[in-house]
C-alpha cells in the first residue's frame, strides 16, 4: 500500500489497542500524512504518545463529535495545514455504559438512544458534509461497523441499532458523493479487545464464542 503524500484524518484513537491506532500505524508505515483527533484533554496525552511512536510528524487536534462548531474548527485547521484531504477514517462510537448490558427494552432511554446514534452514526455524515469542499477527487471515507447491526448480540443492545443506522448512512453517502468519485465504505470487524469493547457487558464471552466458531485458528 502506497499512501505517500496522502492526507488522512483519523478519528477514534482512544488507546494503543484501538482499531484506529492500528490503522494509523499502517498508514504511517505507508507514507501518509496523518492528523489524529482526540475528544478531550484526558485523551490528548494518549493520542500524542501514540503519535510519538510513529515514523512521521503526526498532527493532532481536539474534536468532540457531538459539537458542530468543533467539527468546523477541525476543518479550518486542516485547510490551514494541508488545504485538501484524501482520507477520513471514522472509528468513533459511543453509548452510555448502562445501556450495554441487561434487557434492551427495560434499559433503553430516549437520551441514550439519541446519543448512541448521534456519535456512532450521524457524526460520520456530519464530517462528510463539513469537509465536502476540501475533499480531493477520489477521496476515501471509511467507517467501522459490527455484526451486531445485523444479528442480535447479547448486551450490544442500542449499539446494534446505531451500527445499522451507520451502515445505511454509508450507502446513502456513497450515492451522494459518488459523482465526485469519492468512495464511502464500512468495515465490519470482528470482536477486538479495545477500550470501547470493555464497556460491553460479557464481551469476553463474545470473544470466546467467536474464537470457537471461527474457521481460522
Regions found by a protein language model. Name each.
Residues 89, 142, 184-187, 197:
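Hydrophobic structural elements of the Rossmann-like NAD(P)H-binding subdomain
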